């Protein structure tokens, strides 16, 4: 089994990446292969050209960024984690582009993410995290994915790099998320 996580932060080693590493470590301790992908830009948003509905090749017609590589990784994984910091009470444009473009491609190609396990991870300084968490979970639910819970919402608090490490509840929430995601993936394979 494999989980691929996407870091939607422009900071490769910031708080979002820190939270993702904690969840991925728990999955690895259960023998699950993991991969962390940094959504490096520039990344274009969906232009609603609907070429993915015409070609039906599992790819977005926009091919000058990493989104098609990400879609391929998502299709090949058993679990997907989408992580984002909270910017003005919303997710980053890089993650939004991945959600929109992979969502269109997935729907056009036979619901290619159906029954995969999906988890949202959100870094926040103060407010807006629930909106980001909800937006990511809507993507999972629209794509008929299964969402594991944790001991609280999958949120870590901090501003400066590595600040989330001083949020014990946030770190514990990520550990429990990784444990529950691994358990759920194994149950779905039985």
What label would you give each PLM region?
Residues 154-156:
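Short, solvent-exposed aromatic-acidic interface loops
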Residues 1-108, 158-190:
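N-terminal beta1-alpha1-beta2 submodule of the flavodoxin-like/Rossmannoid cofactor-binding fold
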Residues 93-94, 108-152, 172:
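Short, glycine-/small-residue-rich phosphate/pyrophosphate-handling segment
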């Amino acid at each position: 089994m494999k989980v691929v996580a996407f870091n939607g932060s422009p900071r490769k080693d910031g708080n979002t990446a820190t939270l993702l590493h904690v969840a991925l470590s728990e999955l690895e301790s259960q023998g699950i292969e993991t991969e962390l992908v940094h959504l490096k830009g520039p990344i274009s948003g969906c232009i609603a050209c609907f070429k993915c509905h015409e070609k039906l090749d599992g790819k977005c017609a926009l091919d000058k960024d990493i989104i098609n590589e990400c879609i391929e990784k998502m299709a090949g994984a058993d679990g997907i984690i989408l992580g984002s910091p909270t910017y003005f009470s919303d997710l980053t444009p890089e993650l939004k582009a991945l959600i929109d473009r992979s969502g269109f491609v997935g729907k056009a190609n036979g619901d290619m993410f159906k029954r995969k396990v999906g988890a949202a991870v959100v870094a926040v300084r103060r407010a807006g995290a629930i909106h980001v968490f909800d937006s990511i979970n809507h993507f999972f639910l629209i794509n008929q994915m299964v969402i594991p819970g944790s001991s609280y919402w999958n949120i870590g608090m901090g501003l400066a790099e590595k600040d989330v490490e001083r949020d014990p509840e946030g770190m514990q929430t990520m550990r429990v998320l990784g444990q529950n995601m691994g358990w759920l993936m194994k149950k779905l394979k039985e």
